[in-house]
């Protein structure tokens, strides 16, 4: 009842998806609905439509829509919960990764850059130790060259050519501390040429012709210049060792003490998850593909077929019993789980008496019958068929409501005892009075069966036997149809009579009805007019074919009323 085929398509809010979610059934069938379709449903509009529908909805339709709304909302909530959980886990992992390694470089690696653009060109005059002197302050350099150091070579041929070079002590640096450059590792040190390569004295020399001559150990020890060079080299090594320790102390001044930094707080949940990820995963069992075994017995013997035919009923009963036991066991297990889940006493002990009051009481059949007998059926609303498009545009049903409401009270008390398929109950109900149909149809004297009608009915009854039934429940359906037609005809009579009185006792058929009516409605009105004319309720006159039809009241029938 109240079923409209367009309610699932014309309404916005995804009513079609809600209907499918309610009627598909199991969770496996719900996988047919895509995530895009479920997320497109507007829950607010759907709830407003179900709660405050613009037109009456069937009970089954409204219940299915409510179930579908809950299922769609549950799916939308599960999608949202999974997204939030995934994002939360990612954020916690990144946070723990950063806190465990505080000095990690988080800059994005640009692999498309050219390494040559990031490297400085090599400069042979660049000395990085210069920037470490006295808190990154360079001393002023004064190169004073003593020309007297460039002496002429002596007559002694044993003197080395290296002795003609100027002394390294002539290159001095004027600073506020009066330090020499050779006293600091970070300065420009022009050492003596005798200690040019290593700290040990050279074991060779150049002669007058430029040839290399090896020197013995005695010559090296006897030469005072070589001994001075060795002493100078030893002094330089000690100074460099001291200066290196001083430089290291200065460098540590700018370093960060790792012991002062706060310890990272590990997130236990994330650590456990990372630990579990590093563990080797357990091997999963491969799904064994089930194959159909070939049937070796291609043919069945006659004896086997006869046994199957004889024991068919017993085998079906046994299979049905097994199926029933299996289902009953599964359903009982599900009921136990539901009872554990919906145990209201576990939430709060004060809810138990309130929930017991809401449970329906188990009444006996006798009590139900007693309750049904005491119901006043005249006040109970019975479902009616929805009026079609033609019924909404019939003018005589609309205009006759005020005239037909006179006898509504008496008709509601008596009612009609015709049964309809809508009254599918154990006890009899009476049809309620419709305001668009008057209850009294006896106002027309010619509606009663005349002598001609009685003769015709007697002749028809002689030709048909008593056991002849053309259709099932024909008498009952014809009685209901005749009652509806008589009420429609009575409504048209009241409508036409009012129009004739307003038009001074006569009116044409074209002016009786509005011009915007459809052709089936006009045909139904003409049928009612001819039916009332045959029963002497109206006087109908037409001068020539296809001309105007004049309608007036029959004064005899009016006086009788």
Curated annotation (Swiss-Prot):
InterPro entries: Rad21/Rec8-like, Rad21/Rec8_C_eu, Rad21_Rec8_N, ScpA-like_C, WH_DNA-bd_sf. CDD domains: Rad21_Rec8_M_SpRec8p-like (cd21789). It is found in: Nucleus; Chromosome. One of its GO terms (biological process) is sister chromatid cohesion. Residues 223-241 have a biased composition (Polar residues). The keyword Phosphoprotein applies. Residues 223-247, 401-436 are annotated as: Disordered. GO terms for cellular component: chromatin; cohesin complex; condensed chromosome, centromeric region; meiotic cohesin complex; meiotic spindle; nucleus; pericentric heterochromatin. Residues 401-412 have a biased composition (Low complexity). Keywords: Chromosome, Meiosis, Nucleus, Phosphoprotein. Phosphorylated during prophase until after meiosis I. One of its GO terms (molecular function) is ATP-dependent topological DNA co-entrapment activity. It comes from the Eukaryota. Its main location: nucleus. Pfam families: Rad21_Rec8, Rad21_Rec8_N. Interacts with moa1. Belongs to the rad21 family. Involved primarily in the early steps of meiotic recombination. Required to ensure reductional chromosome segregation. This is Meiotic recombination protein rec8. The gene is rec8.
């Amino acid at each position: 009842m109240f079923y409209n085929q367009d309610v699932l398509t014309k309404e916005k809010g995804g009513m079609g998806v809600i209907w499918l979610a309610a009627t598909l059934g199991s969770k496996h069938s719900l996988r047919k609905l895509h995530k895009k379709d479920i997320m497109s449903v507007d829950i607010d509009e759907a709830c407003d439509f179900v709660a405050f529908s613009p037109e009456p909805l069937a009970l089954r339709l409204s219940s299915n829509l409510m179930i579908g709304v809950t299922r769609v909302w549950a799916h939308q909530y599960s999608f949202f919960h999974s997204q939030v959980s995934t994002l939360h886990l990612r954020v916690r992992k990144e946070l723990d990764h950063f806190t465990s390694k505080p000095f990690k470089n988080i800059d994005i690696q640009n692999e498309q850059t050219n390494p040559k653009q990031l490297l400085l060109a090599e400069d042979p005059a660049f000395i990085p130790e210069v920037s470490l002197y006295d808190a990154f302050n360079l001393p002023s350099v004064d190169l004073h060259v003593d020309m007297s150091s460039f002496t002429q070579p002596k007559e002694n041929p044993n003197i080395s050519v290296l002795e003609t070079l100027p002394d390294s002590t002539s290159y001095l640096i004027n600073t506020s501390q009066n330090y020499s450059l050779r006293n600091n590792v970070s300065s420009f040190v022009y050492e003596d040429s005798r200690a040019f390569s290593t700290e040990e004295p050279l074991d060779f020399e150049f002669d007058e012709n430029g040839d290399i001559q090896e020197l013995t150990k005695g010559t090296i020890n006897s030469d005072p210049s070589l001994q001075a060079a060795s002493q100078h080299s030893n002094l330089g090594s000690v100074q460099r060792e001291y200066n290196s320790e001083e430089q290291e102390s200065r460098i540590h001044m700018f370093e960060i003490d790792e012991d002062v930094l706060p310890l990272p707080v590990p997130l236990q949940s994330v650590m456990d998850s990372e630990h579990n990820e590093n563990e080797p995963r357990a091997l999963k069992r491969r799904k064994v593909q089930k194959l159909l075994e070939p049937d070796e017995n291609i043919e069945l013997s006659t004896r086997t077929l006869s046994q199957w035919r004889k024991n068919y009923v017993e085998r079906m009963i046994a299979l049905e019993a097994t199926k029933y036991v299996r289902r009953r066991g599964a359903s009982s297990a599900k009921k136990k789980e539901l009872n554990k889940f919906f145990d209201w006493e576990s939430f709060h002990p004060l809810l138990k008496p309130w929930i017991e009051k809401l449970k329906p009481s188990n009444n006996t059949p006798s009590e139900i019958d007693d309750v049904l007998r005491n119901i006043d059926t005249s006040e109970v609303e019975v479902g009616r068929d929805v009026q079609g498009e033609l019924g909404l545009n019939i003018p005589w049903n609309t205009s006759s409501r005020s005239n037909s409401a006179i006898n509504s009270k008496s008709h509601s008390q008596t009612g009609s005892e015709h049964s309809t398929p809508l009254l599918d109950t154990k006890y009899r109900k009476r049809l309620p009075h419709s305001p668009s149909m008057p209850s009294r149809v006896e106002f027309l004297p010619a509606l009663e069966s005349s002598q001609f009608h009685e003769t015709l009915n007697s002749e028809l009854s002689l030709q048909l036997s008593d056991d002849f039934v053309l259709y099932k429940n024909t008498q009952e359906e014809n009685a209901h149809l005749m009652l509806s037609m008589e009420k429609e005809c009575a409504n048209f009579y009241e409508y036409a009579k009012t129009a004739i009185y307003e038009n001074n006792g006569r009116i044409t058929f074209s002016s009786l009805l509005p011009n915007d009516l459809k052709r089936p409605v006009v045909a139904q009105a003409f049928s009612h007019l001819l039916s009332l004319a045959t029963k002497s309720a109206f006087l109908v006159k037409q001068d020539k074919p296809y001309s105007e039809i004049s309608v007036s009241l029959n004064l005899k029938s009016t006086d009788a009323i």
